[in-house]
Amino acid sequence: MTCRVEVTISAKAEIVWGLLTDAKGFPRWNSTVTGIEGEIREGERLRLHAPGMNRTFTPTVSGVVAARRMMWSDGLPFVFRGERSFVLTPDGDTSTGFVMEEHFSGLMFALVKRMLPDFGPIFEAYANDLKREAERIARKSGATQA
């Protein structure tokens, strides 16, 4: 199963990246995350808390290319695993394409898929929250033509 969201943000990739890698600031702008413990950087294991969920997610950050992409992975390979990628594509000096995609796999997936929430609305909220905050920062700093 794969869930994907894509949005164009009227802000530089560096602004978007700054939001995506500021663990302490996430709850301020992101309605889908109530807290992240740890630092969002290569090789780090995070503790992520989401509203309404009675568990803590512990993804490991990998594949980091600053202001371009990263991946968060959680679970056991071949058993049940989630891999979430974040990709930023600068479009000129004032716009950034953002794609977030999560792929679930493993032998246990068929058994647990009915217990998973509908990620579509969650991903849409995440992308819209990111867009709103990045564009607010860009307007405030004069880093956009909007």
Regions from the PLM with identified roles:
Residues 1-37, 41, 146:
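Hydrophobic ligand-binding cavity/cleft-lining segments
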Residues 37, 49-97, 103-108, 132, ...:
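Hydrophobic-ligand binding "helix-grip"
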Residues 43-46:
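Secreted/surface-exposed cysteine- and glycine-rich disulfide frameworks
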Residues 103-146:
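A conserved amphipathic terminal alpha-helix motif
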Residues 6, 38-41, 85, 109, ...:
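Short capping/connector residues at structural and topological boundaries
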Residues 4, 49, 114, 118:
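Conserved short-loop catalytic and cofactor-binding motifs
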